[in-house]
Regions:
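Polybasic/polar functional segments that serve as interface/processing modules
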Residues: 1-108
Length: 108
């Protein structure tokens, strides 16, 4: 996906806040976090969730990002929450333009 310039130039704390905000708005429950800033550029942010995890990786030099959303459905169906998170991140990262998003999902 192609990110907005604002996101592509963001530091780890900004991206962590973005991920925390969208995860909570989607109704998922964060329990731990990790960030890494790479040299000369690039940022990864991961939130561990009660439901599994979500990761955001930004390649600032290419103005690109990947998002990995994983949810478990052991105690309840979290698929709708994962879909909502994808929509919220699309809005935040690409101003809602999901044309460059590529989806891979396993259900069952």
């Amino acid at each position: 996906m192609t990110t907005t310039d604002a996101i592509a130039s963001s530091a780890a704390p900004t991206l962590l806040h973005l991920l925390q905000t969208t995860v909570q708005a989607a109704g998922l429950t964060p329990v731990a976090e990790a960030t890494a800033t790479f040299s000369p550029q690039g940022v990864s942010v991961v939130l561990l969730l009660e439901e599994s995890h979500v990761a955001l990786h930004v390649w600032t030099e290419y103005c690109k990002a990947t998002v990995d959303i994983h949810v478990c459905d052991y105690q309840q169906d979290n698929y709708a929450k994962a879909q909502k998170l994808a929509v919220l991140l699309a809005i935040a990262l690409t101003d809602g333009d999901r044309a460059q998003w590529h989806y891979s999902e396993i259900t069952g």
